[in-house]
Amino acid sequence: MELDLKPIELPGIEKKRPMIIAGPCSAETEEQVMDTATMLANKGIKIFRAGIWKPRTKPGGFEGIGVDGLAWLKRVKQETGMYVATEVATAKHVYECLKAGIDVLWIGARTTANPFAVQEIADALKGVDIPILIKNPVNPDLELWIGAFERINNAGLKQLGAIHRGFSSYDKKIYRNLPQWHIPIELRRRIPELPIFCDPSHIGGKRELVAPLCQQAMDLGFDGLIVAVSYTHLTLPTT
């Protein structure tokens, strides 16, 4: 399979494995965001991530700080020099992020599973040239995952990357999401030029599993890691 891709270009970031993206799963307060960003910047991390719109399985939970969080990400960018990344699920999210100067966007697993939603995002991104990362769908459907890349690529986006965050399962004895490594391996075989990131935090669901999952991803030739880190709960591997 051929997509019209080009390498992810973020000036100042070395082209070597692993490219690390880190930050809180959810931006909850400005203080939390800034404390975490400062800590990560001091450790040499160049790309800061934080979710500001959070799709939840059930209503009633915290669904993200919303547009207000974009100002916090802009402050991170201004005060630390880090690139900033967040998740988008609708065209409105895309417009707000582009207006705020967000550097990297990713599409979450629940959104990837909906071709209508992916197409809406693709249409909103036409004429834009920024890195777009796409998480695997919640179910282990490689064709659905590839279809999302095709939709975004057809809109003219060439700096694409995959995020492997595991797959939903009733079996949670070890992992929150089953890794099923053969699926991203097959993705690599089908689209060899597509960089693949591992999300060990969502796969493992436990702090103690993050480092070994990172190592396994590196052993399998993954290109980067996207790790959930907060100021009070550091999960970033030290190696």
Tell what function each PLM region has.
Residues E30-M39, A89-V94, V210-C214:
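Short, acidic/polar
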Residues M1-I21:
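N-terminal amphipathic alpha-helix/helix-capping segment at the start of soluble metabolic enzymes
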Residues E63-A85, A124-D129, I183-E193:
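Alpha-helix-loop-beta-strand connector modules within alpha/beta enzyme cores
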Residues T232-T238:
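Conserved small/polar residues in nucleotide/adenosyl-binding loops
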Residues L125, D129-I226:
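Catalytic alpha/beta core domains of metabolic enzymes, predominantly
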Residues G23, F48, C97, D199, ...:
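Conserved, mostly hydrophobic/aromatic
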Residues Y83-T90, D103-P115, P131-P140, I163-H164:
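Catalytic beta/alpha-barrel core
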Residues M19-V33, A85-E87, S201-E208:
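Active-site mouth loops of central-metabolism enzymes
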